[in-house]
């Protein structure tokens, strides 16, 4: 027996409530009485505030359900409208959607806001409205650390990129800001081969030596993607930047040398004072011992002659001992020292050099030619090196290599010298220790001794013959020539006829 199928009418039973998250469009507001509305997740372009559960107490609250769903739909549409208006570039629609009394900036699930969508589509008018009227931060990052300046740089809309970059930089955008993978705006411009963007960023102060998480510089991406014009430009800029930085660091090193010279002078003065005090103390001790020994010796001789020793010792020791106790101090001596007199410079008379007359080019046979055509010797014939003019700090300064390849400076009294110019260790040693450098011409760095057994040799001449040259120089291959080639190959002589 066939069962009759049960059909539910829409008027009699309400539809089932779905627990799936709602989409952006308006949803059905009819719900089963007594059920709870599921919490909606954050929609793309929606706020990040938590939504409370809406409870329906009875079927009579249908009007409240309609109002709640309509309110939610209007909120979602408004959020989407703000982001979409910024992406499209409709300024009037954007002003209508953005709430000037907002407390939080509307962000989607990827961290994008209206200013990010406007920058991604190069909508300069929307950028001006959001930054100037609604005070959006210029360096607002996304979830991946991308700022509007990062999003502006792409291959699309190349004509609109430069005005947007120029405007963001004038509003104070960080030109060297990095994403989570370490990319700067200059890295992105180098990847896309945008020469105009690269020039604008470099002129605004972008770091051409910045490295990303993989250790690549902007010029490395130009080489990877075969952007030759951009690579040449960056190479020239990097060379000029390195030369400028080197000149600045060398100027710092020159100032440091002047300070080290003054510091060394004060150290030597104090060192000389200490040694002078020690020498005077040793001299007093030696003098007292010597006078005492002489006194005791004379006392013994007088005692043998009948003179009391104590009277002789009192007369002889009174004068030198009192004089030694009242010896002037080193400081007083230094104050009493006369100022050093600079010896007058000798005055030399300027000697006139008599040079021989030039060769007589005239063809007069009656005049005898000039044979004395010697010239004074200007080449130094000495074998000893010339004294270097720069001051050498080897006796006062200790230069060691740090972990970054630079130099660490310490004086002889173990004081650390800071700050130190950011120069290579070899350059610092060459400037601070000029006496350690060779005075002769340096040999090429590639000239080093090699083992003679590893030098490639020519092939020894033997019975083997090479047919390459013979076949190259020959115009025709006749029968005797082919027979000789066959003999060389098989080493069997042809039968004689």
UniProtKB/Swiss-Prot annotation:
According to the UniProt entry, the coiled-coil residues are: 239-264
Concerning SMART domains, the annotation shows: ANK
Main localization (coarse): cytoplasm
| Location of region: Disordered | 1-65
Q: Where in the cell is it found?
A: Cytoplasm, Cytoskeleton, Spindle; Cytoplasm, Cytoskeleton, Spindle pole
Q: Residue ranges under compositional bias (Low complexity)?
A: 12-27
**Assigned keywords, A-Z:** ANK repeat, Cell cycle, Cell division, Coiled coil, Cytoplasm, Cytoskeleton, Mitosis, Phosphoprotein, Repeat
Q: Name one GO cellular component term.
A: spindle pole
Compositionally biased residues, Basic residues: 1-10
Matching SUPFAM superfamilies, A to Z? Ankyrin repeat
Give the protein's biological function.
Answer: Required for normal progression through mitosis. Involved in chromosome alignment and cytokinesis via regulation of microtubules polymerization.
SUBUNIT field = Interacts with PSRC1; recruited by PSRC1 to the spindle during mitosis.
What is the protein name stated in its UniProt record? Ankyrin repeat domain-containing protein 53
User: Whose protein is this, by species?
Assistant: Mus musculus
